Amino acid sequence: RPITIAAISTDILAKTLERCGVKVEVLGFTTKTWKGGRARDYWIKNNKPGSPGRLNELLHIIYKHADHPIRRSKQNFGIMLKEGLLKENIDGEALEWAFKRIISRQEKRKILMVISDGAPVDDSTLSSNDGNMLDLHLKSVIKIIEKKSNVELAAIGIGHDVSRYYTKAVTILDVDELAEVMTKKLIEMF
């Protein structure tokens, strides 16, 4: 249910912003598999050396490219709802990817809004490394974006307090509030 509301809310907000002449890109992330993939298999084949780092394959998805009109991306939003698509979350690397994409843009003002339903989690990575590795990495990426760039970063946590990560953060307990809170957060930034 949260991903359905997120897809609908994002679609509506993207259409509205596009009508106002604002370029919008919609990105998503997950892992390709549960509990590791080829990276984990490779690590096991090599006798499980210590501190292996990430042990899962990333899946970064461009639902709507900033230079494409929303009508060309309409069916991509349906992909968000695909059964079995969403698995584990390696938030730090996903945020780095989104940040690299947005800083390469020509627009003067850049706002990156994160919608999160939990902390970074990847069972294979966390069970084979320091248990807070993904948390620490996310915090370091956020710090770079917030302190050393002109990108304005905001986050909305769905049933999860994201203020322990992001400076500009709000938590909602009811996913039905998402569209309203996304809109309010953007208005605050303008």
Task: Label each region the model flagged.
Residues 1-190:
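Acidic, glycine-rich A-domain
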